[in-house]
């Protein structure tokens, strides 16, 4: 472990449960790398992801974005090609893009949007896009005829969240350079979305644990009972 990491760890009491404000203040102090570190939120939920009725998945536009340039690939035909290009899509196409991905193992994009009529074509990529979390999905607003709005939302800082096999959601909420106020705004918008997405089948405590960390910094635990304060 580097000297900077060791210094950062000293600032954090690993047994403490901090308030949101304290944690965000600490995450900016413990971000000491030479690059602008990403701040990530990890939320452990009281759900069993093996059951279809306990899946937690959705998308939300963070008020201050993530600080990351997002490359958008759109599968569309006809008029929707122009609409996607005008809205700022980085790549637009149909079968030829499917072939490019299959043959060249090409993944120079971060989000995939598709019009519903293209899902038959995109479905052929399920095995390669699925494991990377890139498969378009109506729940996250990436399967839609309104491609202009989908692209605008993504470029504005829309993030997808979904519970993994261990019932944890990992989502970036910005860069350490954002400062406390912007990180706090993004944190609250995301947590409110996750709380609203609670499945009816989930029993007991829903928000089990919450932590934030910068790319190279230690994890900072937040009191799960105070995340919406």
From Swiss-Prot:
One of its GO terms (biological process) is translation. The keyword rRNA-binding applies. PROSITE patterns: RIBOSOMAL_L1. Coiled coil: none annotated. Signal peptide: none annotated. Keywords: Repressor, Ribonucleoprotein, Ribosomal protein, RNA-binding, rRNA-binding, Translation regulation, tRNA-binding. GO terms for cellular component: large ribosomal subunit. Pfam families: Ribosomal_L1. GO terms for molecular function: rRNA binding; structural constituent of ribosome; tRNA binding. Part of the 50S ribosomal subunit. HAMAP family: Ribosomal_uL1_B. NCBIfam families: rplA_bact. Belongs to the universal ribosomal protein uL1 family. Binds directly to 23S rRNA. The L1 stalk is quite mobile in the ribosome, and is involved in E site tRNA release. Protein L1 is also a translational repressor protein, it controls the translation of the L11 operon by binding to its mRNA. This is Large ribosomal subunit protein uL1. It comes from Clostridium botulinum (strain Loch Maree / Type A3). The gene is rplA.
């Amino acid at each position: 472990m580097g000297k900077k990491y060791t210094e950062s760890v000293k600032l954090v009491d690993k047994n403490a449960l901090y308030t949101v404000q304290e944690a965000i203040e600490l995450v900016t102090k413990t971000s000491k790398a030479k690059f602008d570190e990403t701040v990530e939120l990890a939320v452990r939920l009281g759900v069993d992801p093996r059951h279809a009725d306990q899946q937690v998945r959705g998308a939300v536009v963070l008020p201050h974005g993530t600080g990351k340039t997002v490359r958008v690939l759109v599968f569309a035909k006809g008029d929707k090609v122009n609409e996607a290009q005008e809205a700022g899509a980085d790549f637009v196409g149909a079968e030829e893009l499917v072939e490019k991905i299959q043959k060249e193992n090409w993944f120079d994009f971060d989000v995939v949007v598709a019009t519903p009529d293209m899902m038959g074509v995109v479905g052929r990529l399920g095995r390669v896009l699925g494991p990377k979390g890139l498969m378009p999905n109506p729940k996250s607003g990436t399967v839609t005829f309104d491609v202009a709005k989908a692209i605008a939302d993504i470029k504005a800082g829309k993030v997808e969240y979904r519970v993994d096999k261990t019932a944890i959601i990992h989502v970036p909420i910005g860069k350490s350079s954002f400062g406390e106020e912007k990180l706090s705004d993004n944190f609250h918008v995301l947590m409110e979305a996750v709380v609203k997405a609670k499945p009816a089948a989930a029993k007991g405590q829903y928000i089990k644990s919450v932590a934030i960390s910068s790319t190279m910094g230690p994890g900072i635990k937040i009191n799960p009972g105070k995340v919406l304060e």
